[in-house]
Regions:
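Transmembrane helix-loop-helix hairpins at membrane boundaries of multipass inner-membrane proteins
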Residues: 1-7, 21-116
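C-terminal regulatory domains involved in ligand/effector binding and gene-expression control
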Residues: 5-16
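Hydrophobic transmembrane-helix microenvironments that flank and shape a buried ionizable site
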Residues: 12, 74-77, 130, 139-141
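Transmembrane alpha-helical core residues of multi-pass small-molecule transporters
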Residues: 14, 37-40, 90, 141-145
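Alpha-helical transmembrane segments of multi-pass membrane proteins
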Residues: 16, 85-86, 146-147
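Juxtamembrane transmembrane-helix termini
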Residues: 18-21, 93, 147-149, 155
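Alpha-helical multi-pass transmembrane bundles of energy-transducing inner-membrane proteins
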Residues: 117-120, 124-169
Length: 169
């Protein structure tokens, strides 16, 4: 197994650790950490995409001792890497484009929570694209919907708050 084949797992693990670390950071450090995570995940995913284009093959990365129906497994191929590259580019441009507006509309004491929710949304998208088993897909669909609802409610006024609360009910 080549080292680049470990990058999808590293993307998931790095993003999860970054989301946890952002909870104790200042808003400025959390923003920088989130931007670093997006760029690092994008770079690792592009490396995996180049690898899958060169080999023309897909591979399964088994996490643990059991294969897909009973254990967690990641499947990586050309389709997965291309679609995740598009997702990560959209996340990068959205985060950079909305940075000034989010700084104005979100309280400074809650900006690190915004970064945590962005990290969790990105984490769930990475895991959903790469997963090869239903249990992992279900878990990360739940993480994705809760993080997305939290991102909608971060503005804390108007229709966004009502929509987020309705979803949570």
């Amino acid at each position: 197994m080549q080292f680049v084949q470990n990058f999808p797992f590293f993307c998931i693990l790095l993003t999860l650790m970054g989301a946890v670390a952002s909870s104790v950071m200042s808003s400025r450090m959390a923003r920088r950490t989130t931007l670093f995570l997006i760029l690092a995940d994008l770079a690792m995913n592009v490396s995996v995409m180049i690898y899958t284009f060169q080999t023309g093959d897909s591979y399964a990365y088994k996490m643990g001792h059991f294969p897909a129906p009973w254990g967690n497994e990641i499947r990586v191929g050309v389709l997965e890497t291309v679609s995740l590259t598009v997702f990560l580019l959209v996340i990068l441009f959205s985060f950079l484009g909305g940075m000034r507006r989010s700084e104005k509309e979100i309280e400074p004491t809650k900006y690190n929570i915004y970064c945590i929710l962005t990290d969790l949304t990105m984490l769930s998208l990475i895991a959903l694209v790469y997963t090869n088993d239903l249990f992992t897909a279900y878990v990360f669909i739940e993480i994705n919907t809760l993080a997305a609802a939290g991102l909608v409610m971060m503005r804390q006024h108007g229709r966004a708050l009502v929509a987020g609360v309705r979803y949570m009910m």
